[in-house]
Design a protein with these regions (language model features):
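Hydrophobic/aromatic beta-strand patches that form the interior of the parallel beta-sheet core
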Residues: 15, 36, 58, 81-83, ...
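Glycine/Thr-rich phosphate-binding loops of Rossmann-like dinucleotide-binding domains
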Residues: 24-25, 67-68, 91, 142, ...
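Structural signature of beta-strand start/N-cap positions in the alpha/beta core
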Residues: 12, 56-58, 79, 112, ...
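FAD-site-proximal beta/loop scaffold in flavoenzymes
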Residues: 31-53, 131-133, 138-189
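Conserved beta-strand-loop-beta-strand element in the redox core of flavoprotein oxidoreductases
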Residues: 1-9, 123-139
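Glycine-rich dinucleotide-binding loop and its adjacent helix/turn
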Residues: 13, 18-76, 171-173
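Conserved beta-strand segments of alpha/beta enzyme cores
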Residues: 8, 34, 79, 112-113, ...
């Protein structure tokens, strides 16, 4: 690896694997205390502090990551409600039948699951708890709200580079970008 006078590094092949970051949905109240994504160690520690047995927890998102979080929360014996905008759980990976099987399994374990449902807003309630308003008219009490509503690829730094991007770096079936010898892998694609 050699650097030129501008600090650029020469390469034979380049792999871009800069990952992604959590996306916060455009919901009133997302900035309130007690609402966390589950992305960093600090997020995890904050969740553990509030996810005590018997705590009311609302999990927004029932995708792949949301279901991993769901499993961990269920083991902590919280009162868990999952809200998923799509018509089934794990909608990007499962068909209707499989998504409904996961939903039934969760409900058999005592998890409340709302599919085809959106969070319209979150407000502070008395005593530091939260009120989560759903688009179906229901309001949920929550000690903790976790947002697992998706991620966005870390591609901002590629603007003007000539690499073709959409919601991530565009690659072929061999993970090659439109520029020879530049590849991308993981959440950045």
């Amino acid at each position: 690896n050699k650097k030129d006078n501008n600090g650029a590094i020469e390469y034979d092949k380049l792999l871009i694997a800069t990952g992604s970051h959590p996306v916060s949905p455009p919901i009133d109240g997302m900035e309130l205390s007690g609402i966390h994504s589950c992305w960093t160690l600090e997020d995890g520690r904050n969740i553990v502090k509030r996810a005590k047995p018997g705590a009311n927890v609302v999990l927004m998102g029932a995708g792949f990551i949301g279901c991993i979080i769901l499993e961990a929360l269920a083991l902590r014996k919280v009162n868990l409600t999952v809200i998923e905008m799509d018509d089934r759980m794990v909608p990007r990976m499962m068909d209707q039948n499989a998504g409904n099987l996961i939903k039934s399994w969760c409900m058999d374990k005592g998890v409340n699951v709302h599919t085809s449902t959106r969070v319209d807003g979150i407000e502070k309630a008395d005593g530091g708890a939260l009120k989560v308003r759903l688009n179906n008219g229901e309001t949920l009490d929550a000690d903790l709200v976790i947002s697992a509503t998706g991620v966005a690829a870390n591609i901002q730094f590629l603007e003007g580079s000539g690499l073709e991007t959409d919601f991530g770096v565009l690659v072929n079936d061999r993970l090659q970008s439109n520029i020879p010898d530049i590849y991308a892998a993981g959440d950045v694609c």
